[in-house]
Amino acid sequence: MLISTRSRYGLKVMYELAQKYGAQPVFLKDIANAHNISEKYLSKLVIPLRGAGLISSFRGAHGGYALAREPRNITMREIVQVLEGEIAPATGARGRRHGEPADSHPTESVWSLLDKTVYETLENVTLESLIQAGRNNAINYQI
């Protein structure tokens, strides 16, 4: 499964909002500048994320975007699914929903296993776990 630029950038937006969860809303231009991504492009990504109830937008001088739920309650699967559509990494799995049985050809069991593995992996990674992983991998320059 190739994760598109759309999902990669959408995940970056969600990660930035998760890092600022509970603080003031974040301006999209700040995220765009931090990652050298077009603000116009990011503005197209936040529309489906907001529509899915993953983020909220606020107007005014203190406006911007914020997560609509706690980072621990938002999974990578939700984000990718909103931005990409149904997750089916293998051609043989396309057209089926997660958990539906594959047809009888022996190769279909491989595609079904791949589908299940990708789905479960994305489902088990939350924004909170990504933030924690980022903290654990941060370089400590203290002497």
What residues fall within each predicted segment?
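Alpha-helical residues within the helix-turn-helix
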Residues: 33, 50-51
